[in-house]
């Protein structure tokens, strides 16, 4: 009976330890994941601007590339093309699980211009589109790749009204 109790206690201790995994990345992991995120976002911008998802290879999983391809097809069906430029991003949080999975929550800042796909005419521009995004990454053969991207929120900053001072004599 005592032997079974010891085995049970050891098993429970192992389960608790596994459930309390430290998800804080090491400095090297943080740098590697941030580099992968940056490279993916630049490739994503190029994919949107050129309507070519091949630039995502090596940065994203086949499923993620297929998801981007679907979005690009939807743009073409609405006769739109997007020219996207990544202005910057800031990592809000990062967690590493079992040394091979990462979750990164970030704020992305984009300069986005929408064009007619056929006539090339500008339909609209937002030079500072903000997106709160969640990226899922996986370490594959020593390289972090994006396996999923979820846009949590979008924000279009509203320009502040400019106050015009009255001219003298008014």
Report residues per predicted region.
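Bacterial N-terminal signal peptides
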Residues: 7-17
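Short solvent-exposed beta->alpha transition segments
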Residues: 53-103, 111-116
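Short, low-complexity N-terminal intrinsically disordered segments enriched in polar/charged residues
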Residues: 18-54, 58-65, 74
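Bacterial N-terminal signal peptides that target proteins for export
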Residues: 1-7
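Exposed beta-sheet edge and beta->alpha loop/turn motif
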Residues: 99-170
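Short, structurally constrained coil/turn elements
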Residues: 14-16, 80, 85, 140
């Amino acid at each position: 009976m005592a032997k079974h109790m010891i085995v049970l206690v050891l098993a429970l201790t192992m389960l608790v330890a596994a459930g309390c995994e430290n998800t804080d990345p090491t400095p090297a992991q943080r740098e590697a994941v941030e580099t992968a995120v940056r490279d993916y976002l630049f490739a994503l911008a190029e994919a949107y601007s050129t309507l070519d998802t091949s630039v995502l290879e090596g940065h994203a999983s086949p499923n993620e590339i297929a998801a981007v391809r679907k979005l690009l097809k939807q743009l073409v069906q609405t006769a739109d093309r997007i020219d996207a430029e990544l202005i910057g991003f800031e990592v809000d949080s990062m967690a590493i699980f079992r040394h091979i999975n990462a979750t990164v929550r970030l704020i992305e800042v984009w300069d986005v211009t929408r064009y007619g796909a056929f006539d090339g005419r500008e339909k609209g521009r937002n030079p500072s589109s903000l997106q709160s995004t969640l990226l899922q990454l996986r370490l594959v053969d020593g390289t972090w790749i994006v396996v999923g991207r979820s846009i949590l929120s979008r924000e279009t900053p509203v320009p502040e009204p400019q106050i015009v001072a009255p001219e003298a004599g008014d």
